[in-house]
């Protein structure tokens, strides 16, 4: 599925009036494209508020990042667990009204999560880099910045906020984008989790051959429905390449209980990323323990 970048909408000046003519391609075709277009504007605004140089200065004073992949590979429970802090989503709306990111992060860590994912998108997920900063103050396990990253500036934002890893989504990035952003991330000490949704995207990522952490998202980008068979199909069809390249495989979306985790583990997943099902529970601590089999 092609995700276009926001097209220019040129202004026309007549006498003292300036106006823009609506272009037939001036509206996003789907929710992911809408998010990408909004992200472009969000980053433009952020750059005006905080310069890249300011972010670099802040990063200089930060401690070294934690090893995200090692935290997953060294997990006592299998598959390893990445618990996600997410207040809302386009498909569900508000997931948790009593949202206390710091408390949720502490419960995830106490419950036995190996890593934590923090949504930093504002408009569609009601997150933010300020949320990541607050969570970082409370926990010691590695943190993934989960956002719709299009530009190097966003990786600097993630690192400055205290992230140890960042998400890149193959569906919204070209091969050149993926290669360049991976180099920027490496420079910053950030681990990249690159996310794919189908065999075409997975082949692209494998051919680039620089990623050791790949996430298979079980959610269909058009219908937003989830199907764990996506992990099964991709993990099994590309098992040899995944093994040869020592890739840590993460199954994402549509995971609700221990049975789901055991299922994707049997398909070849080394880790899982679980968000909505945990965020929806009254007892988050107990929910984490149940997922990893400690309750």
Curated annotation (Swiss-Prot):
InterPro entries tied to this protein: Aldolase_TIM, Indole-3-glycerol_P_synth, Indole-3-glycerol_P_synth_dom, Indole-3-GlycerolPSynthase_CS, RibuloseP-bd_barrel
Reactions catalysed: 1-(2-carboxyphenylamino)-1-deoxy-D-ribulose 5-phosphate + H(+) = (1S,2R)-1-C-(indol-3-yl)glycerol 3-phosphate + CO2 + H2O
Stored SUPFAM superfamilies: Ribulose-phoshate binding barrel
EC assignment: 4.1.1.48
Molecular function terms from GO: indole-3-glycerol-phosphate synthase activity; phosphoribosylanthranilate isomerase activity
Coiled-coil portions: none
Entry keyword set: Amino-acid biosynthesis, Aromatic amino acid biosynthesis, Decarboxylase, Lyase, Tryptophan biosynthesis
Listed Pfam families: IGPS
Pathway(s) served: Amino-acid biosynthesis; L-tryptophan biosynthesis; L-tryptophan from chorismate: step 4/5
One record GO biological process: L-tryptophan biosynthetic process
Cited HAMAP family: IGPS_B
Family, per entry: Belongs to the TrpC family.
Name of the featured protein: Indole-3-glycerol phosphate synthase
Species assigned in the record: Prochlorococcus marinus (strain NATL2A)
Gene transcribed to yield this protein: trpC
């Amino acid at each position: 599925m092609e995700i276009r970048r926001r097209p220019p909408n040129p202004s026309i000046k007549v006498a003292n009036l300036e106006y823009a003519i609506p272009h037939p391609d001036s509206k996003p075709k789907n929710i992911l494209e809408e998010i990408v277009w909004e992200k472009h504007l969000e980053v433009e605004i952020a750059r005006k508020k905080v310069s890249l140089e300011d972010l670099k200065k802040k990063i200089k004073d930060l401690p070294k990042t934690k090893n995200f992949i090692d935290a997953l590979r060294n997990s006592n429970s299998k598959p390893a667990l990445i618990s996600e802090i997410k207040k809302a989503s386009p498909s569900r709306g508000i997931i948790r009204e009593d949202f206390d990111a710091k408390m949720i992060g502490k419960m995830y860590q106490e419950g036995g999560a190996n890593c934590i994912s923090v949504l930093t998108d504002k408009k569609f997920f009601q997150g933010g880099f300020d949320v990541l900063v607050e969570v970082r103050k409370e926990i010691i396990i590695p943190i993934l910045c989960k956002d719709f990253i299009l530009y190097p500036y966003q990786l600097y934002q993630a690192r400055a906020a205290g992230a140890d890893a960042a998400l890149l989504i193959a569906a919204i990035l070209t091969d050149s984008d993926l290669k360049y952003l991976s180099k920027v991330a490496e420079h910053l000490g950030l681990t990249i989790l690159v996310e794919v949704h189908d065999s075409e995207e997975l082949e692209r990522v494998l051919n680039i051959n620089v990623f050791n952490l790949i996430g298979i998202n079980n959610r269909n980008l058009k219908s937003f429905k989830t199907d764990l068979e996506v992990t099964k199909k991709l993990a099994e069809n590309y098992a040899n390449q995944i093994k040869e390249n020592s890739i840590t495989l993460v199954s994402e979306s549509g995971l609700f209980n221990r049975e789901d985790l055991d299922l994707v583990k049997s398909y070849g997943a080394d880790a899982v990323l679980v968000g909505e099902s945990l965020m929806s529970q009254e007892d988050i601590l107990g929910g984490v323990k149940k997922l990893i089999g400690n309750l």
